Swiss-Prot record:
Annotated pathway: Cofactor biosynthesis; 7,8-dihydroneopterin triphosphate biosynthesis; 7,8-dihydroneopterin triphosphate from GTP: step 1/1
Designated name of the protein: GTP cyclohydrolase 1
InterPro entries per UniProt: GTP-CH-I_C/QueF, GTP-CH-I_N, GTP_CycHdrlase_I, GTP_CycHdrlase_I_CS, GTP_CycHdrlase_I_dom
Keyword Lipoprotein: no
Length: 189
C-alpha cells in the first residue's frame, strides 16, 4: 500500500479552499494545506500498519482468566464525512495456552485500527477479530463508546450523543454471566 502523498493532499486542500470561496493565498490559510497534509498523515497512519503486529509479543503466563483493559481513548475519522469521532474502547479477553500479550499492545492495536477512514462498528469487530486470530484466546469482548462529530456538528446536531458497539467472540458468545461481569467491570470507575 502506498504511503500518504502529502503533495496531493496539499493540492486537494487548496482546491477545497477555493471551492468554498476562500483565497488559498490569504495569510491565515496560506500554510493550511501543509498543516492538513501533515495531520492526515498522522491521523491515517494506521492505513500503513498491520494492527496484528502489536499482538505477536506474548508472555508465557499460565493465566486463563479475564484480562480487561478499559477506557482506552481513541480518535478516528468517519469514512462517510471525514470528520472525527472519538471515545474509548474496552478490550477483554480470556487467554489460553500461555498467550498473554502486553497491556500496551492492546491499546496500540486499537490505535492502529482507529487511525484510518473508519466506521465504529468496523473498529470494534476488527479489534476482536485481530485478538482472536493472533492470541487464540478462549474468548474476546470489545465494547466501544464514541461521539461522532458528523452527528454533533452537522445533520441532526446532537452533541453528547454516544454510540456503543460490541463484538463478542469465542466462549463469551454463549456466556451471558461472563459478558455481564465484563460490563459491570467497565461501568466501575
Amino acid at each position: 500500500m502506498a504511503k500518504v502523498n502529502l503533495e496531493q493532499i496539499e493540492h486537494a486542500v487548496r482546491l477545497i479552499l477555493e471551492a468554498i470561496g476562500d483565497d488559498p493565498n490569504r495569510e491565515g490559510v496560506l500554510d493550511t494545506p501543509k498543516r492538513v497534509a501533515k495531520m492526515y498523515a498522522e491521523v491515517f497512519s494506521g492505513m500503513h500498519e498491520d494492527p496484528k503486529e502489536h499482538l505477536h509479543k506474548v508472555f508465557g503466563e499460565d493465566h486463563e482468566e479475564l484480562v480487561l483493559v478499559k477506557d482506552i481513548p481513541f480518535y478516528s475519522m468517519c469514512e462517510h464525512h471525514l470528520v472525527p469521532f472519538y471515545g474509548v474502547a474496552h478490550v477483554a479477553y480470556i487467554p489460553q495456552g500461555g498467550k498473554v500479550t502486553g497491556l500496551s499492545k492492546l491499546a496500540r492495536t486499537v490505535d492502529t485500527i482507529a487511525r484510518r477512514p473508519q466506521l465504529q462498528e468496523r473498529i470494534t469487530s476488527t479489534v476482536a477479530n485481530s485478538i482472536m486470530e493472533v492470541l487464540e484466546p478462549h474468548g474476546v469482548m470489545v465494547v466501544v463508546e464514541a461521539e461522532h462529530m458528523c452527528m454533533t456538528m452537522r445533520g441532526v446536531k446532537k452533541p453528547g450523543a454516544k454510540t456503543v458497539t460490541t463484538a463478542v467472540r469465542g466462549v463469551l458468545e454463549n456466556d451471558a454471566a461472563a459478558r455481564n461481569e465484563i460490563l459491570s467491570f467497565i461501568k466501575t470507575k
